[in-house]
Amino acid sequence: STPIKSSAASDVYKRQDMMNSEIGFGRRILQAFEDNGISFEHVPSGIDTMTVFVHQDEFMDKEQNVVAAIHRLAKPDMIDIEGDLALIAVVGRGMRSTRGTAGRIFSALAHANINVKMIDQGSSELNIIIGVSDGDFENAIRAIYNMFVLVQL
């Protein structure tokens, strides 16, 4: 079976045109969290975006300090903060050699009417991290479990 873990979180989403070509942008963003004593849970990024997932309870009291530090250190075009998120890690050694695993996960979530807010799969293909609303967490776990454990395709 595939182990499933989660973590309640807030995400801090930053956007800056051509962020990927600016040396040190990611380090400066993470510096703002480090300077405020906040560790990050997950950091997916794209060409123009970077999202930092942190534990909501660690972040709430320091939000304004972190946002001010990000503006000062990295000067992003935009910062957006969303709370009450849950991260689910679908993990398994067999994922790398099994076709359709991601499709089965997202089909199960769609059939359960769960909106996926974030997807990240590393090149190792050993896990897929999925972000959903905290209120959808239990139903998401149930849908994924049912797809992989109860339904044998």
Regions found by a protein language model. Give the residues of each.
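Single conserved hydrophobic/aromatic residue that forms the stacking wall/gate
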Residues: 1-13
